[in-house]
Amino acid sequence: MNTELLEKLKKIQLECAKKVIARDDFEKVETIGGMDLTFEKINENPTRAWASLVVVELKTLKPVYQHVVKDIVDFPYIPTFLAFREMPLLLKLYETAKVKPDVYFIDGQGIAHPRGCGIASHFGVETGEVTVGVAKSKLFGYAKEPAPQRGSYTYLKYKGKIIGAVVRTKDNTAPVYVSVGHRISLKTAIDLVLKTSKYRVPEPTRLAHNLLQVVRRKELRR
């Protein structure tokens, strides 16, 4: 990947960051959709990939809809440029889904990104949907470890600015990294993540991940 192209992609991310709405910009939340992707060979390019959406009811956490798409991904894995690898497939998933949840949880970063526009923010700005970034590891910033009890959290910061939260979703279990994607406040994002978490990973993205593992195994046996 040449330097000139990377600079163009950085500019796209910086422009995206300017469009992020980091406040609650919706009326209600009754359903939440989890989105996830998996690759046949993550370090190869091009490679086959699958993306899934599982929609759950907020009150019951029971799944009410699921959808999977597959395609060839033809953009290399480059740290901090994940959106350019995954967005085409996520958009295909979004556009072909028959159910649109009130909020999308995306396995990745929102504004907790060096240029303020990770995959969750990129997807939100592109589609206009309400999105939250829920990642299993930290990409950017610094934070203290939250207390070991479920519901504890600390703020993820960079240069004194809050860019996300480190949230303990289960007692004595590794935290998740929550950040604003688009059209939501960090406070509400944290609240929704905790409301939807039975285990470490919130149910919408956990179920989306589990669905992908089943689909991927079946596909690779063919």
From Swiss-Prot:
Query: Where is this chain's protein located in or outside the cell?
Result: Cytoplasm
Cofactor(s), names only, from the UniProt record: Mg(2+)
In this chain, Mg(2+) is annotated as bound at 36, 107
Q: Which GO terms describe its cellular component?
A: cytoplasm
Pfam hit, one: Endonuclease_5
Its main localization is cytoplasm
- Superkingdom of source: Bacteria
Q: Write down the InterPro entries for this protein, in alphabetical order.
A: Endonuclease-V (IPR007581)
EC class? hydrolase
Question: GO terms for molecular function, please?
Answer: deoxyribonuclease V activity; magnesium ion binding; RNA endonuclease activity, producing 5'-phosphomonoesters; single-stranded RNA binding
Q: Which CDD domains match?
A: Endonuclease_V
Function, as annotated: DNA repair enzyme involved in the repair of deaminated bases. Selectively cleaves double-stranded DNA at the second phosphodiester bond 3' to a deoxyinosine leaving behind the intact lesion on the nicked DNA.
Tell me what this protein is called.
Answer: Endonuclease V
